[in-house]
Each structure stands twice: as C-alpha cells, then as structure tokens.
Curated annotation (Swiss-Prot):
Amino-acid biosynthesis among keywords: no
Transmembrane parts of this sequence: none
Phylogenetic placement of the source organism: Bacteria, Bacillati, Actinomycetota, Actinomycetes, Streptosporangiales
GO cellular component, one term: cytosolic large ribosomal subunit
Protein's recorded name: Large ribosomal subunit protein uL13
Assigned protein family: Belongs to the universal ribosomal protein uL13 family.
Domain of life, per lineage: Bacteria
Length: 149
C-alpha cells in the first residue's frame, strides 16, 4: 500500500478562535498543536502541513497549576557562549503572556521546517480582541479545567 499524500487542492484550512481564560496552559497547548498539525482531519499526513490557523485570545488569563508560576523558568539562548538567559514564569506572564503560550505550543510541534511553518499559523493575543474578524474564525471550545490552587 502506498503512502497517502494529500494534494494542496485537497487541503481546506479553517480559522479557529480559542478563549484561553481559565484553561490550564499545557492542556491548551496540546489542543492548539493538534489543530496546527491537522491531526483532527481525515486526510492528515505527517509529512504535509494540513493544519488550520489558530487564534488564541485572553492569553493573560491562562492558568499554571501548582507552584509552576514561581518555580518553572523560561529559557532562551542568544547563540553566544554564556548566552543562556532565564526568567520565572511569573515574570514572563506579567511581561508577555502571549510568549508563554507560544513557547508551550511550539514545544509540542515538530522540530523542523514543517514545524516552523505550522507555528506561523498560530496567532496569540493577551487581550480579548484580535484583528482577524475578516477570516470569520470559528469558536473552538476547550473545557475550563481551572484546578483549585
């Protein structure tokens, strides 16, 4: 049996909008990564970008469980020797909450050119507004599982 490869004409991209308020960060990221990869579609193929566009709003209201807000750190490297920088997630969420969501989702995508192309279809906004009304995004519901602190 030959490997199925969807043609570009077969792929229909849709826009989804997700409200991230009171949703656990990891659960949100895994659902978003599935939509970006296209694994929810019947013609999914791992070597083809069949995914949809995803808009995440209210990224500043996303929840980290346990003590992760104080203990977990976000790392980045400049590429130079000794260029590793880290900040706690509490500081990252205060400064740039959209970056925290992007970082979580990108960690769940493939680490190659296909994954980078998929990541470009992710749009994250800290507030409730987004400039993509013309694309007519469809609301995508994620169960709010905010666990007690």
């Amino acid at each position: 049996m030959r490997t199925f490869s969807p043609k570009p004409s077969d792929i229909q991209r849709q826009w989804h909008v997700i409200d991230a308020s009171d949703v656990v960060l990891g659960r949100l990221a895994s659902r978003v990564a599935t939509l970006l990869r296209g694994k929810h579609k019947p013609y999914y193929a791992p070597h083809v970008d069949t995914g949809d566009y995803v808009i995440v709003v209210n990224a500043d209201k996303v929840v980290l469980t346990g003590k992760k807000l104080e203990q977990k750190r976000a790392y980045r490297h400049s590429g130079y020797p000794g260029g590793l920088r880290s900040i706690p997630y509490s500081e990252l969420m205060a400064k740039n909450p959209a970056r925290a969501v992007e970082k979580a989702v990108k960690g769940m995508l493939p680490k190659n050119s296909l994954g980078r192309r998929m990541a470009k279809k992710l749009k994250v906004y800290a507030g409730p507004e987004h400039p993509h009304q013309a694309q007519k995004p469809v609301p995508y519901e994620i169960t709010k599982i905010k666990q007690p602190a």
